[in-house]
Each structure stands twice: as structure tokens, then as C-alpha cells.
Design a protein with these regions (language model features):
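Short glycine/serine/threonine/alanine-rich loop segments
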Residues: 50, 120, 152
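Acidic, Mg2+-coordinating phosphoryl-transfer loop and its flanking beta/alpha structural elements
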Residues: 127-170, 174
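Conserved Lys-Pro-Asp/Glu-containing loop-to-beta segment of HAD-superfamily phosphomonoesterases
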Residues: 103-141
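Active-site neighborhood of HAD-like aspartate-dependent phosphohydrolases
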Residues: 1-53
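Short, electropositive alpha-helical surface patch
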Residues: 62-85, 104-118
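Short, flexible/disordered intra-domain loops and linkers
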Residues: 22-29, 62-72, 100-104, 134-141
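Substrate-recognition element of Asp-dependent hydrolases with the DxDx(T/V) motif
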Residues: 38-75, 88-100, 129-132
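Short amphipathic alpha-helical segments and helix-helix/interface helices
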Residues: 38-43, 79, 111, 143-144
């Protein structure tokens, strides 16, 4: 299996989910880490020398539905928990706006920012994992489109948990 240097992951419904079962959390407390996904990332993508980069749209910050400081504390906790659990470097980029922005997925600003910071220049060394793949029942295809726009491999988080996961990786058209 190919080893990726940089593994981009969406946050909501990819790495975490609400405890309440609601689409949007009731507060920063309404979340649980998806350890089955972290285990799959570690085992299947051979995380030994990889960095996990969390990329997340959080338009609720701009609209005032989510407190910026509370969300920052939540992200710091998530980053620390994943770092400790996987024993790997974890970083994140958050787009707090609903407006048109080069950072808001499906645009690639967040991915590019992390790749530049980490000096990962070869896009063949990157993969994106997300839950917005355009599958039936999903709200959009923005995670898949982000990977397409950045020209990197992509896999839906649900597909990553399957036995035949390697055949479900979508490779970019170059």
C-alpha cells in the first residue's frame, strides 16, 4: 500500500460526530471522536511518518451560531486527542466564513496552506478523506470536489472502513 505524507481529513461526520444525532452540534460538548475511523486511517494508510491535516468549513462562526473561542478550544482538544491517539503530527485549517473564499471547500486554500506549511510539494503524496462525496443521502460532494480541484487522491470515510477500500480510492485526472 502506498504511504501518504499528508492525509487531509474533513472534520464533521468524518473525524467526529454529534452525540445528539443532530446534523449540527448543540454546542461544543455535543461531539464524539470516531475512533473506528482513526483506527482505519492508522492501519490502512500507514501513518508512521504522515501528518494528518484537518480541513473544515465552519460557517457557523461567521453567522454567530458558533462561538469562535469555544470552537478554537474544541479544535485544540480534537488535535491533541488525535495526536495522542495516533502518535502522529496533526494540524488544522478552519474556514470560518460562509462567503465565497479561496479557503472554503470545495476551493483548495486550506489544503494548499497546510501543504505549504509542511513543505509537501508533491500532490501524489496527499489523500483526502471526507463524508461529502455526492453519494445518495449525503448533503453534497464538496469534499470529493475539493480533492478533485487540488488534484489528489480521495476516499469517502465510509469506503475507508470497508474491506475492499483500496479499490475505492478515486485518483485525480491529470
Amino acid at each position: 500500500m502506498k504511504q501518504y505524507k499528508l492525509i487531509f481529513c474533513d472534520l464533521d461526520d468524518t473525524l467526529i460526530q454529534t452525540i445528539s444525532g443532530e446534523t449540527f452540534p448543540r454546542g461544543v460538548y455535543d461531539m464524539k471522536i470516531k475512533f473506528d475511523v482513526l483506527d482505519a486511517i492508522h492501519e490502512k494508510l500507514q501513518m508512521e511518518s504522515s501528518v494528518l491535516g484537518i480541513v473544515t468549513n465552519q460557517g457557523g462562526i461567521e453567522s454567530g451560531k458558533v462561538d469562535r473561542k469555544a470552537f478554537s478550544n474544541k479544535m485544540n482538544y480534537i488535535i491533541s486527542a488525535i495526536h495522542e491517539y495516533l502518535d502522529c503530527r496533526v494540524t488544522a485549517s478552519v474556514c470560518p466564513t460562509n462567503q465565497s473564499s479561496s479557503y472554503r471547500k470545495p476551493n483548495t486554500g486550506m489544503l494548499n496552506q497546510i501543504a505549504v506549511q509542511l513543505c509537501v510539494n508533491n500532490k501524489a503524496d496527499c489523500i483526502m478523506i471526507g463524508d461529502a462525496s455526492g453519494y445518495e443521502g449525503q448533503f453534497s460532494d464538496s469534499d470529493k470536489k475539493t480533492a478533485e480541484n487540488y488534484k489528489i487522491d480521495y476516499i469517502d470515510v465510509g469506503d475507508l472502513l470497508k474491506d475492499e477500500w483500496e479499490s475505492l480510492i478515486i485518483h485525480p485526472e491529470l
